[in-house]
Amino acid sequence: MKTLQFFFLFCCWKAICCNSCELTNITIAIEKEECRFCISINTTWCAGYCYTRDLVYKDPARPKIQKTCTFKELVYETVRVPGCAHHADSLYTYPVATQCHCGKCDSDSTDCTVRGLGPSYCSFGEMKE
């Protein structure tokens, strides 16, 4: 019985501590309409699991906030997109997460949908590295 209890506690600890919300490296596709192609860049963003629960009984007095792994702090970096027309603005600014936490998704600055386009989506056919 003690082995079963230890195993249960170990699984809880692993779920909470080991799969936490943390910075991770990702590759995103960036595009400028004036340039008509995409390039991929490496950046950091937040990924992982946050403890959350969904009650069976919906209490109107309790806020309905599901915590998600999101950025706590971020900076912006700028890259020049090659191959743009001379009159076009070839600079593209993108966010880089520097610190993560489990919190409410801010829909003013983040795509909080279940099925977003994804970081590698490119609306143009040509992708350059």
Curated annotation (Swiss-Prot):
It is found in: Secreted. Keywords: Disease variant, Disulfide bond, Glycoprotein, Hormone, Hypogonadotropic hypogonadism, Pharmaceutical, Secreted, Signal. Residues 1-18 form the signal peptide. Its main location: secreted. GO terms for molecular function: follicle-stimulating hormone activity. One of its GO terms (biological process) is positive regulation of steroid biosynthetic process. Disulfide bonds join 21-69, 35-84, 38-122, 46-100, 50-102, 105-112. It comes from the Eukaryota. One of its GO terms (cellular component) is extracellular region. It is linked to Hypogonadotropic hypogonadism 24 with or without anosmia: A form of hypogonadotropic hypogonadism, a group of disorders characterized by absent or incomplete sexual maturation by the age of 18 years, in conjunction with low levels of circulating gonadotropins and testosterone and no other abnormalities of the hypothalamic-pituitary axis. HH24 is characterized by primary amenorrhea in women, oligo or azoospermia with low to normal testosterone levels in men, and infertility. Together with the alpha chain CGA constitutes follitropin, the follicle-stimulating hormone, and provides its biological specificity to the hormone heterodimer. Binds FSHR, a G protein-coupled receptor, on target cells to activate downstream signaling pathways. Follitropin is involved in follicle development and spermatogenesis in reproductive organs. Belongs to the glycoprotein hormones subunit beta family. Heterodimer. The active follitropin is a heterodimer composed of an alpha chain/CGA shared with other hormones and a unique beta chain/FSHB shown here. This is Follitropin subunit beta. It comes from Homo sapiens (Human).
